[in-house]
Regions:
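N-terminal pre-ligand scaffold of iron-sulfur
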Residues: 1-62, 76, 92-117
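Short cysteine/histidine-rich metal-coordination sites, predominantly Zn2+-binding motifs
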Residues: 62-68, 81-90
Length: 117
């Protein structure tokens, strides 16, 4: 588990857009995509589990992101694969809003942190 890192500020990511936080900045094994959609910030491993594509470059709608290569969809809330060709989900990461700052907790699953487990 890594320490939280400042990745931006509220308003830096437009609605249904994402930014990529490079693994070199987080110490985590994959780049992490931070999404803003439906009024919430969410983070997932950036690499699609089906092919080596950046999910941050995909199409974001509501609580889903669609891979730009083969149209696999993933839940922004749980990381679950929602349709083929992906059958394996991606990891979630906690994003915390502190004032107007966005803090990413690499390696801390979002649902676990939200549930307090």
């Amino acid at each position: 588990m890594s320490d939280a890192i400042l990745v931006g500020h509220v308003g830096d990511i437009e609605d249904e857009e994402a930014l990529v936080v490079p693994r070199a900045d987080t110490g985590y094994g994959d780049d992490i995509a931070v999404f803003f959609s439906a009024g919430k910030y969410r983070a997932l491993d950036d690499t699609c589990s089906h092919e080596k594509a950046s999910l941050a470059e995909g199409w974001i709608e509501g609580d889903e992101v669609e891979c730009p290569i083969h149209s696999a969809k993933f839940s922004l809330c749980t990381g679950a694969a929602l349709c083929l060709p992906a059958s394996v989900g991606v990891r979630t990461h906690l994003v915390e809003v502190r004032g107007d700052e966005l803090w990413l907790h690499p390696g801390v699953p979002a649902l676990t942190a939200e549930e307090g487990s």
